[in-house]
């Protein structure tokens, strides 16, 4: 993200999948993320209507999209689909999009859900939380704010 964000900026993160899109919300001030919802990825119209409603509700300053990669870091088919989704988010909602390497985010999400005794059907939203938390944890302590 090249533009400076306000100290209390709200972020939405997405774990894009062919059937489901996990969504998480976070805040720069607290540097914490939480799983929010799972959007069923039925078709483009449904996907962007649901995402538009979330954006209207949460009024994020920026978006984060998980970038699926092979274990060796090489891109694959889902990499391109996630990139297309993120670029469409930017084009439709005019919000900056950052990319986060999401390798093993679903593994970490499943482990976290099991440890807490939470429902396994929340794994996509939890994976989005993991992605957003990785983004927040990766910000330098001196992150530039407006």
Swiss-Prot record:
It is found in: Cytoplasm. Keywords: Cytoplasm, Hydrolase, Nuclease, Ribosome biogenesis. SMART domains: YqgFc. It is an enzyme of class 3 (hydrolase). It comes from the Bacteria. GO terms for cellular component: cytosol. GO terms for biological process: rRNA 5'-end processing. Its EC number is 3.1.-.-. The keyword Nuclease applies. GO terms for molecular function: nuclease activity. InterPro entries: RNaseH-like_sf, YqgF, YqgF/RNaseH-like_dom, YqgF/RNaseH-like_dom_sf. PANTHER family: POLYNUCLEOTIDYL TRANSFERASE, RIBONUCLEASE H-LIKE SUPERFAMILY PROTEIN (PTHR33317:SF4). Belongs to the YqgF nuclease family. Could be a nuclease involved in processing of the 5'-end of pre-16S rRNA. This is Putative pre-16S rRNA nuclease. It comes from Burkholderia mallei (strain ATCC 23344).
């Amino acid at each position: 993200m090249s533009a400076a964000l306000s100290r209390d900026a709200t972020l939405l993160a997405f774990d894009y999948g062919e059937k489901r899109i996990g969504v998480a919300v976070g805040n720069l001030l607290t540097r914490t993320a939480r799983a929010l919802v799972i959007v069923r990825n039925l078709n483009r119209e449904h996907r962007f209507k649901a995402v538009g409603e979330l954006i209207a509700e949460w009024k994020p300053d920026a978006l984060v999209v998980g970038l699926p990669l092979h274990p060796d870091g090489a891109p694959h088919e889902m990499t391109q689909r996630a990139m297309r989704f993120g670029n469409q988010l930017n084009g439709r909602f005019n919000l900056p999009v950052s990319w986060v390497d999401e390798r093993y985010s679903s593994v970490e999400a499943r482990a976290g859900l099991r440890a807490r005794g939470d429902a396994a059907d929340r794994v996509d939203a939890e994976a989005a939380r993991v992605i957003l938390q990785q983004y927040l944890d990766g910000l330098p302590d001196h992150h530039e704010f407006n």
